[in-house]
């Protein structure tokens, strides 16, 4: 839910209050990603380790008619691998066999927010990770202030993999 509603800040800055709201569908509603009446986050039991955010839009106006996030089961395993590999040198929590729920929850929130970006029509912005110099990413003051390793949620730079044990950064 929070990964969806993280977009509220951007919409409010553009003048749209409550533009995107995440709600649990009632049990009486059977909706899936093919039902144009609902925009849903759909869990798919699959060996695939990914997520995606497709949308249907009116080519005449650009209006998004319906948008979904498809969340495959094994995305959790790839997130765990990314956290362990990219932050294990500085993050003691990432060195555990089972990662803490708080760490995995933040990772899932990031992916949900990223995929909602795709549902809103945004493409990857891989140049965003070049916005911050390496020495800044190794600065505890900078990383505490910025709370991010890239200037866009649409980049894949989810974790600070340039931080070194002597930098004092633990995430």
Positions of predicted regions on the chain:
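Catalytic Zn2+-binding segment of zinc metalloproteases
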Residues: 116-131
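Residue-level preference for alpha-helix termini and adjacent loops
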Residues: 56, 70, 125, 136, ...
């Amino acid at each position: 839910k929070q990964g969806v509603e993280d977009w509220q800040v951007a919409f409010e800055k553009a003048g749209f209050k409550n533009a995107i709201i995440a709600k649990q569908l009632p049990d009486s509603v059977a909706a899936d990603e093919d039902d144009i009446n609902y925009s849903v986050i759909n869990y798919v039991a699959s060996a695939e380790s990914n997520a995606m955010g497709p949308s249907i839009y009116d080519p005449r106006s650009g209006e998004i008619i319906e948008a979904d996030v498809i969340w495959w089961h094994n995305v959790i395993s790839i997130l765990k691998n990314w956290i362990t590999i990219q932050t294990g040198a500085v993050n003691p929590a990432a060195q555990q066999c089972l990662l803490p729920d708080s760490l995995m929850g933040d990772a899932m929130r990031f992916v949900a927010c990223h995929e909602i970006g795709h549902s809103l029509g945004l493409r990857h912005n891989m140049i965003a990770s070049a916005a911050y110099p390496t020495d800044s990413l190794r600065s505890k003051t900078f990383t505490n202030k910025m709370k991010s390793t890239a200037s866009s949620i649409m980049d894949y730079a989810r974790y600070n993999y340039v931080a070194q044990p002597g930098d004092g950064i633990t995430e």
